[in-house]
Design a protein with these regions (language model features):
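Acidic, glycine-rich active-site loops and adjacent beta-strand->loop/helix elements
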Residues: 24, 54-58, 79-84
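N-terminal beta-loop-helix "entrance" segment that forms/cooperates
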Residues: 50-66
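Glycine/small-residue-rich loop that forms an oxyanion/phosphate-binding "nest" at active or ligand-binding sites
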Residues: 2
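Glycine-rich phosphate-binding loop
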Residues: 63-86
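Glycine-rich phosphate/diphosphate-binding loop of Rossmann-like nucleotide-binding domains
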Residues: 8-55
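Short glycine/serine/threonine-rich phosphate/pyrophosphate-binding segments
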Residues: 30-31, 59-61, 85-86
């Protein structure tokens, strides 16, 4: 398929509260993923964005649960698991 992807309209969300939860492993890659998520959330005019780090990818689901219990509206989960690594 040649051409460009269609542009999707983004609804401003100034009241939204979003947590970006990232593994502390492979920060060189995770930091780029976090930056991309932050750019998208900024474009959507999200009111509150907090970045939280956890030791590894295994802890991300529990941290997401805590974020929702703390009244976050959404969670962006960022992690990288490589075969053979913790």
């Amino acid at each position: 398929m040649a051409g460009h992807a269609p542009r999707i309209g983004i609804t401003p969300l100034p009241q939204a509260k979003v947590a970006i939860i990232s593994s502390s492993w492979h920060l060189d890659i995770c930091n780029e993923l976090i930056a991309g998520a932050q750019r998208a959330l900024l474009e959507a005019q999200v009111g509150t964005v907090e970045v939280q780090f956890v030791p590894g990818s295994f802890e991300i689901p529990l941290a997401a649960q805590y974020a929702f219990e703390a009244d976050f509206d959404a969670v962006v989960a960022v992690g990288l698991v490589l075969k053979g690594e913790t």
